[in-house]
C-alpha cells in the first residue's frame, strides 16, 4: 500500500542482524475457503513450490532463499544464502500465495483451494474466470462483492462492444481513442490511476540496421514523446527520462533523457552511414489500437529524420515468439515492477541471462557486474549509486528508448463504485459494488 509492504497473513516479521533470517508470525485461525485450517504443511508445500524451478516460472526470482522452515502453524522462517535487499519485496509476489497442499498436488487449478479474499469458482480458458467471496477470510472488509467474473476479449473492438452492450460492468485496458466518447457519456464514468509500468521502443540490437548505438540514439532524438502521450494516450501518461518509473527510489534523477531534436537525429544517422536515409520495420500487436496509433505517430516523426518506417502486425503469441527468437527490428514493449523494490523487474533489462535484455539481445559487462553486486548490497546509498550508473549506461547504449509511464484507465458503468487500485497488482475488486 502506498509503495510500502504491509502485513496480510503475516501480522509481523523480523529480520536477523546479519540479514540472513526472516521470521514471519502469522495470524491465528487462518482458514482456506473450504473451512480447513491453514497448516505448516500447506505453507511449506506452497513456498517450496514457488522456489522450485521445475514447478514455478518465478523460481529464478527467489534464488536467494536457502531454506524454509515452519516450527508451527503460525511461524515461517526463511533463511537466505546472502543478504538480499529486495527479498521482502520479491516475497510478496503472487507465486508465494498459500494453497492447500492436496489441491496443489492434484494439478487441476480449477479446484485449487486458496485462502485469499476470493477463490476461483469456475474457469473456462480464454473465456472467463469466476471468483467468489471466501466466507472464511480473516478480514471480511476485503471482500465486499459476492461474485466477480473476469472475461477475456479478443481485441479492443470486442471489449468495447461488450462494455457498451452491458455485458461487462468495468472495462480494463480501455482503448485510448474511445476515452473522450466514454467520458462524455453520462451512462459511464472513467477513472485513471498512476502506474509503475514504463513503456519503451525496443530494438533488436543484433539486427544490422539498428546494431549501432548511434542509430538507436538518432531514433530516440527523432521521437517526440509528448506527441505519443497526447496522440496515442489522450494525455493519460507521464514522460520518463530513464528505464524506470518516476516513483522509483532507484531512479537516477540526474538524467534528462532524450529531447526531441530532428537535426541531432539526422547528424547521428549520417555518422552511422545513413545520410541518404534508412528503412526499418516496426512490429506491433494486431488489434491493439494504442500500438497502431503509436506506430502511425512514429512513422511521421521518424520520416522527418530520413527514416522510412514500415509497420507489420501480428497476433500477440506470434509477436512474442518473434521477439524471443530475435526475428524483428523495432518493437514496442513495457515493464512494470511487482513490488516496492524495482530491482527484480529492472534485472530483465540490465542482466542479459534473464530475458536476453528484454528480447533486445543487448548485453553490457559493466551493467551485469553492477547488477550482481547490487543484489547483496545492503547500504542504501551504495546500491542507489550502482543503479544510477546502470541507468546511465542503458540510456547511452539505447537498446530500449524509455518513453512514458502510462496511467491505467478504467471505464465503468455509472452504477459501479468502490474501485481501488494497487500500484503493483492493478485494480482491486474487493470493495467494488454495483447498484441496480
Language-model regions, residue ranges each:
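Short, solvent-exposed loop/beta-turn-alpha elements that line the ligand-binding surface or hinge
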Residues: 1-17, 93-116, 120-122, 136-145, ...
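Surface-exposed binding/hinge segments that line
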Residues: 14, 18, 25, 60-101
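Short helices/loops that flank or line small-molecule/ion binding pockets
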Residues: 35-37, 157-167, 184-185, 213-214, ...
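Alpha-helical secondary-structure segments
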Residues: 39-46, 73-79, 116-117, 145-147, ...
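Append "and occasionally in soluble cytosolic enzymes with long acidic Gly/Pro-rich linkers
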Residues: 132-133, 191, 211-300, 389, ...
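Ligand-site clamp/hinge motif
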Residues: 136-181, 308
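Ligand/substrate-recognition segments at binding pockets and active sites
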Residues: 270-338, 408
